[in-house]
Curated annotation (Swiss-Prot):
Keywords: Antiviral defense, RNA-binding. Encoded in a type III-A CRISPR locus. This is CRISPR system Cms protein Csm2. It comes from Streptococcus thermophilus. One of its GO terms (biological process) is defense response to virus. The gene is csm2. InterPro entries: CRISPR-assoc_prot_Csm2_III-A. The keyword RNA-binding applies. Disulfide bonds: none annotated. It holds the Pfam family Csm2_III-A. CRISPR (clustered regularly interspaced short palindromic repeat) is an adaptive immune system that provides protection against mobile genetic elements (viruses, transposable elements and conjugative plasmids). CRISPR clusters contain spacers, sequences complementary to antecedent mobile elements, and target invading nucleic acids. CRISPR clusters are transcribed and processed into CRISPR RNA (crRNA).
């Protein structure tokens, strides 16, 4: 079964954000800048997916996974998000334009719930 579906990706985003690590004051360890950086990596790919065939984007999807791994290696809070949101697993499931665009919407939902639940810089 797919990690992300049209029916579940919003709920999965909310759940992932609710599980993120917080400091002793109840603030997220992840910052808005960190999560928005991940979203920006997806946004340009989403835009290109509207204009190009999926076959032309396969390398970009693979590189996106590399970028997420790199960011996770740099920041423990980003790694926490990537693990709890199952981002790497979801990236591996991208097989066509539809699953790519769903993943990008999932990233938007993660940012939205992060801000909704009080994420700050």
């Amino acid at each position: 079964m797919a990690i992300l579906t049209d029916e579940n990706y919003v709920d999965k985003a909310e759940r992932a954000i609710s599980l993120l690590e917080k400091d002793n004051k109840g603030n997220y360890l992840l910052t808005t800048s960190q999560i928005r950086k991940l979203l920006s990596l997806c946004s340009s790919l989403y835009d290109r997916s509207k204009e190009r065939k999926f076959d032309e984007l396969i390398n970009d999807v693979s590189y996106l996974r590399v970028q997420f791994v790199y960011q996770a290696g740099r920041e423990i809070a980003v790694k926490d998000l990537i693990e709890k949101a199952q981002i790497l697993e979801a990236l591996k499931e991208i097989k066509d334009r539809e699953t790519l665009q769903r993943f990008c919407r999932y990233m938007e939902a993660l940012v939205a719930y992060f801000k909704f639940y009080g994420g700050k810089d």
